């Protein structure tokens, strides 16, 4: 049992260190982005399958889209990082019910992703600060409070926006846009 606790704490510490490194790299423009064309539908299916295997909740994990495929210019590993973070966060606050990842084509230029859960939701007074560093909805929940800050920086770097849907009251809904084609400004690669 002691070994399990040490292992778990080691993993949490490593995650915290990696989050701090990611945050610093993003803030100073040092994080490498490898932009290429990827099928966002396939990425969403893969992420949903992955999180479904490790989730520690009875909530049903779903992926919804009307699209057969949607090729976007992105850094697929960073897109997966954002999606996994949002889905894992949802599992922490949704003991049962459902968590739904949805992908839509908002326009010819923009994809729209959302993660909706039927959990406890985020109080209105916390919504404005939820993307700040070290902000946590539940101080007792595992995590560093850096994940949403990192998600925001990644999404902004690739030319999108991320927000909480303030009108959804059945839990919480995080929404973000992602350009289908990268422009010169948001696809530049850092050295």
Regions found by a protein language model. Give the residues of each.
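Short alpha-helical segment of the dimerization/phosphotransfer core of two-component systems
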Residues: 8-13
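Helix-loop junction within the histidine kinase core
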Residues: 24-35
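Conserved catalytic submotifs in the C-terminal HATPase_c
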Residues: 34-39, 60-70, 106
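Short helix-loop "hinge" at the ATP-lid/N-box region of the Bergerat-fold HATPase_c
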Residues: 90-91
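Short conserved segment of the HATPase_c
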Residues: 122-134
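Short alpha-helical Gxxx[C/S/T] motif in the catalytic ATP-binding
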Residues: 147, 151
């Amino acid at each position: 049992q002691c070994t399990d606790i040490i292992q778990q704490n080691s993993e949490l510490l490593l995650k915290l260190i990696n989050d701090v490194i990611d945050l610093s790299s993003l803030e100073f423009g040092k994080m490498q982005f490898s932009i290429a064309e990827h099928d966002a539908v396939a990425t969403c299916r893969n992420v949903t399958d992955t999180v479904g295997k490790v989730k520690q909740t009875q909530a049903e994990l779903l992926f919804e889209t009307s699209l057969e495929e949607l090729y976007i210019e992105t850094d697929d590993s960073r897109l997966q990082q954002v999606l996994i973070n949002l889905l894992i966060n949802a599992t922490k606050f949704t003991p049962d019910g459902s968590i739904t990842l949805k992908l839509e084509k908002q326009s010819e230029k923009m994809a729209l992703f959302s993660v909706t859960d039927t959990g406890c939701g985020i109080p209105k007074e916390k919504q404005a600060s939820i993307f700040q560093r070290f902000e946590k909805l539940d101080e007792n929940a595992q995590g560093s409070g850096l994940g949403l800050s990192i998600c925001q920086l990644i999404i902004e770097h690739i030319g999108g926006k991320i927000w909480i849907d303030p009108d959804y009251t059945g839990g919480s809904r995080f929404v973000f846009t992602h350009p289908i084609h990268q422009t010169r400004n948001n696809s530049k690669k850092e050295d």
